[in-house]
């Protein structure tokens, strides 16, 4: 965005009388006219070196940005609010506004003030909106997270049958995908992609069946005219955008898919105005190709973000060892959309295995990868006119790193996925890479208007202009020496003043050499005669003067022309550049997952089409990493075998009982995460893993309410459980934690009981079901594919030690009172709870409720004095000190025996 001189604002017409309303200036009239066409956006109105905002826009922006609200002129008798942001810092302010959910229309001066004056002294410089900045259409580096895709999504729908499809585009990288969906899958499919913005037709936005989904998504939904989604006009729109005569090479798309594609492209055309970001051809995703994970499961498993919205603490953060922005985005994409094809999963696992077997080579690859900039995003900025010299430099650096990687891989025997990636890297535009290397300077400015980004020696005229601009004195001195040699006048000087400019001056006595012959007169043109000197010029000197005066402007003009030439060449090679960049991301992800596997001791899973689910010594990847970081006790690994009994497994459902704080929820989550990691193509935190492909993953773990929609925690739990029971199939994996809590005990037990029976008999899926309803363990006698397992604990002197080990069998207690004590509840409350528990367990509540109250007065604990803690006697202290001084690992067997006798002696004295 280059600065332009602000034109002088024409004055408003004089009032006709004292009561006449104040007229707006022509500039403000222009603002109101442009704003009327962009009512849903804040209008950044260019005035000189600032973007100004007026009226309600100014009030909203000043509050959102924390900038001063001032005023300028009046309208209808009221001051016009105004605020502004400097053009050079506009990206910083746009970032804040977009984050707060605003859309911004950027209005630029589209003519020079001098041109406006030619139309009359009161003419206003022409302005127009050149771009709409929305969350889903960002390209600027400052506005984007390098590790996260920035998708714009459009929903298409056909009239009549109401069939649905989604198309999503990241204009910062050119990624373009499309897939069909259904109303019951719509929210899950949207959340899998996690778009920054969702555009839908007005009619669909107000559809009663779909509106609840849009309400959940909130501000990210942007309704648009239904004409943008016309599937009948989609073919023409696609052909026009991609500049092709036919769509034969694009594949076949359904009508709802065409509607979605049309809506996405139309919205890009609408927001980018005259620019056309280069996009890949839309790639169709087939239903069932990826693991279906519903939104509740995605949130509770904290795949990409924690429940509080942070990246730290998520599975993605725990496994990310990538070193490039493209690699980080590819890793996130694979994690959020695991595959369901064992063959495709094996291809990815082969890549990781190869990297583990070639660690020295892979270390060298990662060093090269660290030098790879974000080539796709640099290319997109260049294509839409928002790029700078450093974006060209990013391409050059990427080509250099790609060349280094290709050299490292030369002759290597690669698995299929990496072999294809190497081939794409080798097809990068080597000629263009060499061109960039010749053209670009080593140090590049941020903005092209600053110049200095073209290498010396690349363009002879540019070198000359720079020499004139930077070394004019040396050039003049050289010309002066030439004239001295030509005339033989050693006192000849070339001087400069504001009247004559550059001129040649000689003494009157020496002037004859310049005037005596016709040849000399034609060569040296007389300018001025002084008392003791004469002044001349030459055609050469006049041209040099003109060149010096215009050298800076000409130098910048040449550089800008070279920039446009290089940009056009980059866009022409967009497909091969993107292919090479994608290939580099594949190498980044594969080597990163190998580093993770080596670092954490992960194993290669065996994934097939069976119903097996046998995890040996599995671990929770996030919790394990947190424990290591805290230097705490190592994570306790556990087995999980949900394989069919015919395959030697324990059955399809594990009913897990055990204490609070025992690790049930962690165990449930870790097995779901292991399945996700395996199917995304990663090694897994286990001793071994055999997983039959999971087609749908459901979880109900953790408690949350939805007060905004009038749903209690229990209601949310029931809705999510209903979705699981209605959708899970034989190849699904279900994890359920404490279903039935939040209501009366027998109600909850009944619901949990019936749910397990339904999972076993109807869904017939693999499932982990954790519960505190110990009565349910009797189901193992009735349901042949159900096994009881429990979290082991050890009791010691009224305390409970959580072993975090899963073992066969059933728990008969939940140790809630002990956990309450550990949590710091007052001792009197803990004691009272223990007494009540004993009464309840003795079955003495079958009578009236007041019997328990009479026997154990509820509030009597408040009147009781806390028992004083026993004082440690001297002898007790001596015994305690002796025990505390023991270093068990340093004792020999003989020393240990002697110590036992000593401790027994001290205990006897006590």
Curated annotation (Swiss-Prot):
Keywords: ATP-binding, DNA damage, DNA repair, DNA-binding, Nucleotide-binding. ATP binds at residues 658-665. Coiled coil: none annotated. GO terms for molecular function: ATP binding; ATP-dependent DNA damage sensor activity; damaged DNA binding; mismatched DNA binding. Disulfide bonds: none annotated. GO terms for cellular component: cytosol. Residues 1-21 are annotated as: Disordered. One of its GO terms (biological process) is mismatch repair. InterPro entries: DNA_mismatch_repair_MutS (IPR005748), DNA_mismatch_repair_MutS-lik_N (IPR007695), DNA_mismatch_repair_MutS/MSH (IPR017261), DNA_mismatch_repair_MutS_C (IPR000432), DNA_mismatch_repair_MutS_clamp (IPR007861), DNA_mismatch_repair_MutS_core (IPR007696), DNA_mismatch_repair_MutS_N (IPR016151), DNA_mismatch_repair_MutS_sf (IPR036187). Residues 1-11 have a biased composition (Basic and acidic residues). It comes from the Bacteria. Pfam families: MutS_I, MutS_II, MutS_III, MutS_IV, MutS_V. NCBIfam families: mutS1, PRK05399.1. Belongs to the DNA mismatch repair MutS family. This protein is involved in the repair of mismatches in DNA. It is possible that it carries out the mismatch recognition step. This protein has a weak ATPase activity. This is DNA mismatch repair protein MutS. It comes from Brucella canis (strain ATCC 23365 / NCTC 10854 / RM-666).
